[in-house]
Amino acid sequence: MTASDCRSIDQAFLAQQWPSRQATLERYLQEQSRGLRQVFVAEDSGQIAGYATLIPHAKAGPFKKNGYPEITDLNVFQNFQRQGIGAKLLQAAEEQAKTFSSVITIGVGLHS
């Protein structure tokens, strides 16, 4: 992910009537530069379609003590859903995780 991607992703959230995620995305960019997170960005025809992040060691939850990598914050924007983009993002994160672990986890949030 680049600084430009942060702005484009935030604009995509705003276009969907979601709150700004700029601060979170900038934190992801900083963590990526320090090797604490990897961000996978999907594009379609030059537009940001979605993204997923991979952290090398779960920071919370039942897998924290095992040090397993965790896929977090998977988003595919509405205009790009049902095209296999989410599956490709998951596959990219899984392939990267395979380079340093035989186990991978996924963190999910529950929203009402």
Model-assigned labels for residue ranges:
Residues K64-Q78, I106-G109:
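Conserved acetyl-CoA binding element of GNAT-fold acetyltransferases
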Residues V41, Q47-A58, E70-N75:
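Conserved beta-strand in the GNAT
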Residues A97-H111:
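Conserved GNAT acetyl-CoA-binding A-motif
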Residues I9-L14, L25:
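Hydrophobic alpha-helical core bundles mediating ligand binding, dimerization, or RNAP-core interactions
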Residues W18-V41:
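Active-site rim helix/loop that mediates acceptor-substrate recognition in acyltransferases
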Residues V76, R82-E95:
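Conserved acetyl-CoA-binding loop-helix of GNAT-fold acetyltransferases
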Residues M1-I9:
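A short beta-loop-alpha structural element at the N-terminal edge
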Residues L14-S20, A60:
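N-terminal first-folded block
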